[in-house]
């Protein structure tokens, strides 16, 4: 038995609930807090909003939201223990807000209950003149970075926040980028000029002041050392800075600093058409390929009412699992390299090239093929695809057996990773951890099983779990996930349905050619659909999937236009990095290197 396969799965929750439990929470809130009132827009417990995804959405007044959130997490019979996402909307130019209370800015709390297998969204309406909210960092520590992001992007102040400062944009930035009156392109801004004085001032803003973060410079007559790890260091896996407070070689505390890789991915979604935004999704987790396309196109299809053919579902699953393997191979190789083993990364990258050979033959591209489409995929499977897939499936298992010997079975790797950087299931949920990093604690939660999408309920596969939530288990879980992805791909190969690779729907994009062959009007519709993109009906929809690094979700708002009114990207790596201080205190820098490698993140997934 390999070291990876010795992990004993264990279930944390027996009652996973069901979709029928989703609306129960609204009645529960009504019984607990009473019917709608009049003290704020929407009342204490105000309007129940209808959305395109049937996600229970309740408007709550600002002066009651802290109380309601506290109840849902700590006092409800089946609590919502994870703060899945926290974001905001600038509503000032939105036209279609039927059956919603007046709001100039809206704050959205997205909660997840594992006991119910259900989510709930709470919305709070704000006016231009009073953009203030109570912090919820006393309820969820994971809210810290989310609240900082909302202040950074929208200018909404969270009273009581321990350190409300910019997080994605630099300290010297003027304005709040996701407001509708903020420029969306560099051509809409003044030409950039970096004078010597400005350069020096910007550099000074990067100087670390421990007192601002509640850190002491000395203790018992001994000076602490403050060390910059990054933003240019090979072991931080991107442009990422961690300021370490050290007592000798021991880490006393750490301050992660992100934002160096921020590109405005959500803002771009407001100026790209629904179709032309697809390539931008590839660049979020840039190792995940088409996996990034999937939650986006699924959310658009919910808004548009598109049901794709079974063949499309299976093709999407197959290519998503190929990219899961490719991403995990990068993780596997770089993780062992971080720990001092230089050979495995070359073998694993060679096998990743074999994955890309298949991907390129099917999609026409390698790392970022942008192959999924609204209503389908870009083209049908090519001749000979089945032979290429079968050759890979026959080749890969033996390679994984070899990797078990040289990597996860290696005694040096075990010594460096077992018992290092561990956390419990409760801590993982508290901080918003999802994906393999959550399952490494022993919690068998996988969106493909718990909330099947794209036909995943038709596939047989296991959900690998760990026991201790440490660096070793995080690695071992991913190794086993590669084997499970091979099982899924094999089932796709053996059971690929016949049929079309696009839905026969007027909003499928690009539209079907046959729709042009009737009269001049259908030709015009086709031309507009190709050049400007589809007009998606007004509404809101969220879709989350089990991506390579955890749960990746897209929350989309359509205002009845060819572009999105709001694109919110919920990435797994953002909350994962926020945990670094918790799991690194008391360890050595070499342990932190192992922790960073085991988290499996890319900074584009964090900074967007």
Curated annotation (Swiss-Prot):
Any matching Pfam family: Complex1_30kDa
Broad class of enzyme this protein falls into: translocase
InterPro entries: NADH_DH_suC, NADH_DH_suCD, NADH_Q_OxRdtase_suD, NADH_quin_OxRdtase_su_C/D-like, NADH_UbQ_OxRdtase_30kDa_su, NADH_UbQ_OxRdtase_49kDa_CS, NADH_UbQ_OxRdtase_CS, NDH1_su_D/H
GO CC aspect terms: NADH dehydrogenase complex; plasma membrane
Keyword Transmembrane helix among UniProt keywords: no
Region (NADH dehydrogenase I subunit C): 1-199
Xref: PROSITE patterns: COMPLEX1_30K (PS00542), COMPLEX1_49K (PS00535)
A GO molecular-function descriptor: NADH dehydrogenase (ubiquinone) activity
Cell compartment(s), UniProt: Cell inner membrane
Catalytic activity, reaction form: a quinone + NADH + 5 H(+)(in) = a quinol + NAD(+) + 4 H(+)(out)
Keyword line: Cell inner membrane, Cell membrane, Membrane, Multifunctional enzyme, NAD, Quinone, Translocase, Transport, Ubiquinone
Membrane topology: Peripheral membrane protein
Family per similarity comment: In the N-terminal section; belongs to the complex I 30 kDa subunit family.
Function: NDH-1 shuttles electrons from NADH, via FMN and iron-sulfur (Fe-S) centers, to quinones in the respiratory chain. The immediate electron acceptor for the enzyme in this species is believed to be ubiquinone. Couples the redox reaction to proton translocation (for every two electrons transferred, four hydrogen ions are translocated across the cytoplasmic membrane), and thus conserves the redox energy in a proton gradient.
Subunit structure: NDH-1 is composed of 13 different subunits. Subunits NuoB, CD, E, F, and G constitute the peripheral sector of the complex.
Designated name of the protein: NADH-quinone oxidoreductase subunit C/D
Gene name of the encoded protein: nuoC
